[in-house]
Structures are given as structure tokens and as C-alpha cells.
């Protein structure tokens, strides 16, 4: 597996995230060793590292530091951080009953809602400040680079996650989230009002009506984000254009206007994995997955499959190389 990953990194020049010299960089090897607290100064240094180490996973911090290679967080001298949202299909209700394709479609829809209904409509974040990435496996990462968010502390970011998830949905939380980012009125109050409907005059509505409307609003309009990823101001996140070690797929940027049609199992296969075939061994029956328009084998035993399929099955733990 490591040789296949090394080929990808040797045949591609990976562009680093902006201001890479101020970010902590880390990676995990195929032997399970975690290397952190690295400082990378430029594109050349990054690609030399990737070609030499051929890592299983690659990360960079959302935060900007004066000394990113210091091992203790206080000594790094935090100077701000991008605002990051992590959406994982494993968090979907009933995900264990869904196919991989169904899970990815649902989490893609959640990502669209986050971007259009919350980040753009409610928070007023311009499209130019938003970047969406397929995580390389089960979901999406949304990065916000905007002057209004860089210096937000953990508590302020937690308020934002509470607003988006609807976990503390009441007038106080909604209003504080809106005021914090200086956005127009609307958002949850408008959604709850719509759920209340016009069936009865406002002065005749009972408290129970409001509670039911809030419950429906939360169920129908909230987004399932992994909140700790957002409010942890020292979080490291997968580096764009690197490979995910549990799938062999690329952590790839998705244009906002293309998200609705995006198919990661077609568009995130490395070119280096499209040629050739490998033997894999399935120790037990599996639920088949479809990658690159090809359905995987499902019965136990030895199978000859395309390289990208072999990488995915082995990386995800479904198969081994014999």
C-alpha cells in the first residue's frame, strides 16, 4: 500500500494550504506512528516530505501560530484560526442501514444546507471565503477563511455550533449567534415562525405549540456537524489534495455550485490508481461498494480487481493483499 501512496505523491505536486509556514503540520505513517508539530515553509518542503514519508494520513492545523513547531500549545503562540466544520456520514440517523452511496448523498445534502442556509444566508459569509472539501472517506469539511472568524475563541465558536445544530434552540441563543456575527434578523426565528404556521393568531398560541415548532425546526433544518472540530481552536484537519489512508481517495476541493452533482467515488480516484489490477482476499462476505462505476466483489475468497478498488477494499479494512 505504501508504494502506491508514494507513487501518487511522487507524480503530483501538492499545493499547501495558505500560510502553510504558520500552520502545524502532522501525519501518520502506515506503521501507526503519529508525527506532529512540524513546520513546513513552502510547497517544495511539503512535497519533499510527502514523497519521502508516503504517509497514510496528512494533516495541517486550522490555527495560525507564530511558532508552529513548538510541542506545547501555549508556546506555539496562537494567532487565530480558520472556522472549520466537519460533516461525517457516520453521524446520520440510521446510517448503519444505508449503503455507502446513500450515506454520501445524505451528508452531501447536509453540507449544502450548511453552506446555503447558514453560512451564506444567515451569517452572510461570502462564497469567496468558503471552501468545501470531500474528506476522502465519509463526509465533507467546510473551511471559512474570513477576517470576522480568525480571532474567535472556543466559546464563540461553540455558540456558532449550537446555532447550526439547534442544540440550544431558544430566542437567547439565536439572538446571540446573530449579533455575534453582525448578521440580519431571520434564521431560526423565521424557521420556527414558519413551522408555527398561520393556523391561529399569535396571541392564542400555547407554549406547547412553540415547543413543537422548535422541535420540528430542529429536526428539519439543523445540520449534523461534529461540533468539537469547530470549537477546538487547535484542531488539525486533513490537508487538501492528500490521500485518505482508509480509502485511498483524494481529499478534494468541491466548488460550491458543483456540490449537488459531485460524486466522490468517481471524481476523487487518483489517476495513478486507475490503471492495472491487484489480487485481494476477502475474509468474509461484505456489503458491496461501487467505485468508479464498478461494483466490488462481496463473497469471501480471492478476487482480481482494479487498482483503485483494491486500494479501497484494503484501506477500509474489508480485504487484505494475499
From Swiss-Prot:
Residue runs in coiled coils: none
Protein name: DNA primase small subunit PriS
Family: Belongs to the eukaryotic-type primase small subunit family.
EC number: 2.7.7.-
Reported function: Catalytic subunit of DNA primase, an RNA polymerase that catalyzes the synthesis of short RNA molecules used as primers for DNA polymerase during DNA replication. The small subunit contains the primase catalytic core and has DNA synthesis activity on its own. Binding to the large subunit stabilizes and modulates the activity, increasing the rate of DNA synthesis while decreasing the length of the DNA fragments, and conferring RNA synthesis capability. The DNA polymerase activity may enable DNA primase to also catalyze primer extension after primer synthesis. May also play a role in DNA repair.
An MF annotation (GO) of this entry: DNA-directed RNA polymerase activity
Description of how the protein assembles with itself and partners: Heterodimer of a small subunit (PriS) and a large subunit (PriL).
Keyword annotations: DNA replication, DNA-directed RNA polymerase, Magnesium, Manganese, Metal-binding, Nucleotidyltransferase, Primosome, Transcription, Transferase
Source species: Thermoplasma acidophilum (strain ATCC 25905 / DSM 1728 / JCM 9062 / NBRC 15155 / AMRC-C165)
Biological process per Gene Ontology, one example term: DNA replication, synthesis of primer
Cofactor list: Mg(2+); Mn(2+)
